[in-house]
């Protein structure tokens, strides 16, 4: 025992490394078997739907096989024992360090295995690389086969060692899994074109294997592509959502408040009589079809309803819930608990009364028809204010009044529906960041938003708006909305926010490119052949 614990003989330690590598290999094989058993057939097999556990098993398997099997065997075993024997070399220097380095491995393996079964851990899965474990993974640059082929043709005439190495590094460093989160539906393609290189016209990638200094200017081509994915009802921690794992009271509350905010902006409570004399009811949220990802997120969180694009030329998509029982069971409780803050509360109140009348078995069909027709004939009163503001006597005089009614989750949702992050021209050579939310009605809502975000309400001829280009206010807005939004507004915000601190020479040209980029992104529409519902 003393020999194995305290030996500084390279052959003894090499033997220990080889034994340890065999032991680690058996553990890694067990993880591998678990993974393959889970993937052997469709659906959930043995882990009972625990995606968090599945992710950490994958990561633990990789770590064990590489760092505790391959490296100890090749470096510790062969390096300490077999290589010196083969070449007739003496034992290594620093023999005590050689001993210590081995005995640090067993506790490391134990800690790794223990962490693999911590249910609330990070669950890094395929996103072990720190860059990929951040929210920016949604926008990770990736090259598809067409781009790689095209760039290969451009490089062909002047292909050399430098360009080949850069080309290979691009593939290894930038081609990553785009659906890591399980909800990633958007991919960014990026090509950086360098200048100041005499021996090559185009380099693909951001890594340079050269002795020369390469100066680049960020002419970036971005394409946002919709990628159909399946959503998990209980997403794993790896997804790193604003609402985390989709479990727990706080997450549910945040989502519901956010949904009410989205509905206050782009939602509709609709009921009408069909040609057949039947009353139909629907709760729906409309978005530009380039933001269809947001609608699928709502559908996955609620677990009911459908997303449809009636015709791609309309440039709109809708999330709808038409089933009366689903509306009563899932939709009404949300809006009763977290009331609408805009005048849409009036329509919701009529909608709720109508649907409860329709579901009342004690009424005859004629009575139902008369009562619902009366509700349908009602119109919105002038200067209507949602009852949610009764708590502050329909007056917002301080930020405390505003925050007692309007939550951050609601404001995030409302901003995704009605807000705008953009860049505006302030002079011949001056572009600045701007933020704006506008409304035709509901002045009290804009007053509350203005107090929370520390900006002012401006009254126009036909509408009211909260808008600012003030440097300090924009800083506060960037901080307030950091890592919060779910739809394509998150992409617009990210590009807008990351360009805010650009200073010095070339700022105007840089801001012009960002402005054009944001306009191009907003102009993206679904392919004309898209018919998914």
From Swiss-Prot:
Ranges that cross the membrane: 15-35, 56-76, 99-119, 135-155
Entry function: Mitochondrial DNA endonuclease involved in intron homing.
Stored PROSITE patterns: COX1
Gene: aI2
Family statement: In the C-terminal section; belongs to the LAGLIDADG endonuclease family.
Residue span of region COX1 intron 2 encoded: 129-533
PTM per Swiss-Prot/TrEMBL: The mature protein may arise from proteolytic cleavage of an in-frame translation of COX1 exons 1 and 2 plus intron 2, containing the aI2 open reading frame.
Primary location recorded for the protein, binned into one broad class: mitochondrion
GO MF term (any one): endonuclease activity
UniProt-listed Enzyme Commission number(s): 3.1.-.-
Database matches in Pfam families: COX1 (PF00115), LAGLIDADG_1 (PF00961)
Organism in which the protein naturally occurs: Mycosarcoma maydis
Keyword Nucleotide-binding: no
Identification of the protein by name: Probable intron-encoded endonuclease aI2
Subcellular location field: Mitochondrion; Membrane
Keywords: Endonuclease, Hydrolase, Intron homing, Membrane, Mitochondrion, Nuclease, Transmembrane, Transmembrane helix
One GO cellular component, as annotated: respiratory chain complex IV
Annotated GO biological process: aerobic respiration; intron homing; respiratory electron transport chain
Membrane topology classification: Multi-pass membrane protein
Ranges where the record places region COX1 exons 1 and 2 encoded: 1-128
């Amino acid at each position: 025992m003393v020999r194995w614990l305290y030996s500084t003989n390279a052959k003894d330690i090499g033997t220990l490394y080889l034994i340890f590598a065999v032991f680690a290999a058996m553990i890694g094989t067990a993880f591998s078997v678990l993974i393959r058993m889970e993937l052997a057939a469709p659906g959930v097999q043995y882990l009972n739907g625990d995606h968090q556990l599945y992710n950490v098993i994958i990561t633990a398997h990789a770590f064990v096989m590489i760092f505790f099997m391959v490296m100890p065997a090749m470096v510790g075993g062969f390096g300490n024992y077999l290589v010196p024997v083969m070449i007739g070399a003496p034992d290594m220097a620093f023999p005590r360090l050689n001993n210590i380095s081995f005995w640090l491995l067993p506790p490391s393996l134990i800690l790794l295995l223990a962490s693999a079964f911590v249910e609330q851990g990070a669950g890094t899965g395929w996103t072990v690389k720190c860059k990929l474990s951040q929210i920016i993974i949604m926008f990770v640059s990736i090259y598809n086969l067409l781009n790689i082929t095209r760039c290969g043709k451009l490089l062909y005439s002047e292909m050399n060692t430098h360009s080949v190495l850069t080309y290979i590094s691009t593939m290894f460093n930038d081609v990553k899994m785009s659906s890591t989160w399980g909800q990633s539906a958007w991919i960014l393609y990026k090509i950086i074109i360098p200048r100041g290189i005499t021996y090559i016209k185009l380099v693909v990638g951001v890594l340079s294997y050269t002795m020369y200094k390469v100066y680049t200017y960020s002419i970036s081509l971005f394409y946002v592509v919709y990628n159909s994915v399946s959503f998990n009802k209980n997403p794993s921690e790896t997804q790193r959502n604003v609402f985390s794992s989709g479990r727990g009271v706080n997450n549910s509350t945040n989502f519901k408040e956010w949904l009410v905010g989205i509905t206050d902006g782009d939602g509709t409570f609709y009921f009408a009589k069909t040609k057949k004399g039947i009353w139909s009811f629907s709760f729906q949220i409309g978005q530009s079809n380039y933001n269809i990802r947001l609608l699928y997120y709502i559908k996955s969180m609620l677990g009911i309803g459908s997303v449809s694009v009636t015709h791609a030329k309309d440039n709109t998509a809708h999330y709808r819930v038409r089933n009366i029982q689903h509306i009563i069971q899932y939709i009404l409780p949300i809006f009763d608990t977290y009331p609408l803050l805009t005048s849409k509360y009036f329509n919701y109140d009529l909608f709720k009364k109508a649907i409860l009348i329709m579901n009342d078995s004690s009424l005859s069909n004629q009575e139902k028809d008369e009562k619902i027709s009366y509700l349908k004939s009602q119109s919105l009163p002038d200067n209507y204010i949602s009852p949610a503001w009764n708590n502050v006597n329909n007056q917002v005089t301080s930020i405390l009044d505003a925050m007692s009614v309007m939550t951050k989750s609601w404001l995030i949702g409302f901003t995704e529906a009605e807000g705008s992050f953009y860049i505006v021209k302030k002079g011949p050579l001056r572009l600045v960041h701007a933020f704006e939310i506008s409304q035709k009605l509901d002045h009290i809502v804009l007053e509350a938003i203005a107090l929370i975000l520390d900006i002012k309400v401006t009254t126009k001829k036909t509408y009211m708006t909260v808008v600012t280009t003030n440097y300090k206010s924009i800083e506060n807005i960037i901080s307030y909305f950091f890592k919060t939004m779910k739809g394509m507004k998150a992409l617009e915000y990210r590009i807008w926010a990351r360009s805010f601190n650009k200073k010095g020479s070339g700022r105007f040209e840089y801001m012009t490119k960002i402005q054009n980029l944001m306009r191009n992104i907003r102009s993206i529409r679904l392919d004309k052949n898209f018919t998914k519902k």
